[in-house]
Amino acid sequence: MAPTLATAHRRRWWMACTAVVENLFFSAVLLGWGSLLIMLKSEGFYSYLCHYPDNTTYHNSTGNETNQELVMDMNGWLICKEQDEMLNLAFTVGSFLLSAISLPLGIIMDKYGPRKLRLSGSASFGVSCLLIAYGASNPNSLSVLIFVALCLNGFGGMCMTFTSLTLPNMFGDLRSTFIALMIGSYASSAVTFPFIKVIYDLGVSFITILIVWAACAGLVFFNCFFNWPLEPFPGPEDMDYTVKIKFSWLGFDHKITGKQFYKQVTTVGRRLSVGGSMKNPKELSALQNGNKLCLSTVDLEVKCQADNAATPSFMKSVFSPILLLSLITMCVTQLRLIFYMGAMNNILEFLVEGDMDTVSLYTSIFGVLQLLCLLTAPVIGYIMDWKLKDCDDGKEDADEKDTNTDGKKKKKRDRQIQKITNATRAFAFTNFLLVGFGITCLINNLPLQILSFILHTIVRGFIHSAVGGLYAAVYPSTHFGSLTGLQSLISALFALLQQPLFLAMMGPLEGDPLWVNVGLLGVSMFGFCLPLYLIFYKRSLERQRKQKIEDSKLYLKINGTPDHEAFV
């Protein structure tokens, strides 16, 4: 039996804490591809593509050599460029699905809620672990299972991530901070495979590790089954779980929040009160045409807007400049980050001239640094929430705490303008870090790559948190899942370019990533388009607010009230 929204609200801290842990170990673990790649090679996945050519130079992972042409092995299995290309293709497919599946998931989640998706995701993740374990039992015949396993892994991981992004709706003004925390745990999940590699290096069987991991995914399934509600979590503007019940006896065939119910009842009551005072057919027809009359006088008529008039349509949100520019930013950033993750081991091999022990060491360092996302992602969330508590929340009544010592009301910031200001800072800062990361990648210095690891980790945590916070701030909560999914799908399609870039690096460029990195650095400059537009958008909002204040003063002189009304 699924819990109600009121029950889920009481358990929100438990759900948030477990969601962070579950994201850390069961969401985007595929982002730790460098460590998984080493283990897959050690278990012989696609090793049958490698052969000893004539005049070979044998080179194992400890550095012992004979003869001329280089051939290496790992844990007794041959490794080669053809194997790298095939496994990188599997990573490309899995990472694509990790993002591309977001759009249908977002649409489904907005309509049906997160519970069923999270149950499906945890089950898919467990099955993916079992498939990898089965493939490792006979890699010469079952290596192809890695494609199916990584697809299920990507699907399950995105289900876990996406559903956790609905939880921050229960935390009010801290929503962006909690979104950042969820995305931080998602980004930090890249540490999972490096952690598993440490256990693997201690001598634990790869198959045993995966079976235990699949069993842990079962615990995630049961946690969701007993704690997550069927209904979607409403946004903070509709938050009132204590009175959320089903009013079927009032003619509502859906569940509504207390605030929505209050709005429905007061609207109906107002229309009944005004309608009862009407005497002639003309006034009645005005009511039937969708107009409402103020209770104070029948002569004061105000056009009644439909509820959806205040909320932009989904297509209007899709074609808004903010969303389109955010797509450009995410496409560029996603390609830059995904290419580095997929090619990192080969880039390190190029720098150390094939020393696999050094490559393994730096891969482990990269994995450990992924935990930085848990610390850095909330920073961008804090930037997105900066000074929102000091903003005008739209209430007309001033509290005592909102007045100065001389009794005058404090001048508050506009909430929408403050959100745009915060988003501008977040995206500008993130893109500067992305450019810095691109510059460090151009320098062929091994110790400097640790700085590249740090910048890569910070940018990956920042960009997703910034986009999630921006969408939560600008667009209706009912569109959040669909818009985030659309953004993920388009950026995932663009990130497929990492496979031809990888083939170009391994083929014509002979393993040298210099020119690929130069091109990606140039493309990264497009990321500054979004913060520049947000600056102009903020100025437009400031002009509108100034005009609104001047209009309110005019109405105050005419009607004695700042409301935009006029007596007939």
Curated annotation (Swiss-Prot):
Native source organism of the sequence: Xenopus tropicalis
Which residues carry attached sugars according to the database record? 55, 60, 64, 422
- An example Gene Ontology CC term for this record: basolateral plasma membrane
PTM entry text: Glycosylated.
Q: What is its main location?
A: membrane
Family listed: Belongs to the SLC43A transporter (TC 2.A.1.44) family.
Gene Ontology molecular-function annotations: L-isoleucine transmembrane transporter activity; L-leucine transmembrane transporter activity; L-methionine transmembrane transporter activity; L-phenylalanine transmembrane transporter activity
Could you tell me what this protein does?
A: Uniporter that mediates the transport of the stereospecific L-phenylalanine, L-methionine and L-branched-chain amino acids, between the extracellular space and the cytoplasm and may control the transepithelial (re)absorption of neutral amino acid in kidney and small intestine. The transport activity is mediated through facilitated diffusion and is sodium ions-, chloride ions- and pH-independent.
Name-wise, this protein is Large neutral amino acids transporter small subunit 4
Subcellular location per the Swiss-Prot or TrEMBL entry:
Cell membrane; Basolateral cell membrane
GO terms under biological process: isoleucine transport; L-leucine transport; methionine transport; phenylalanine transport
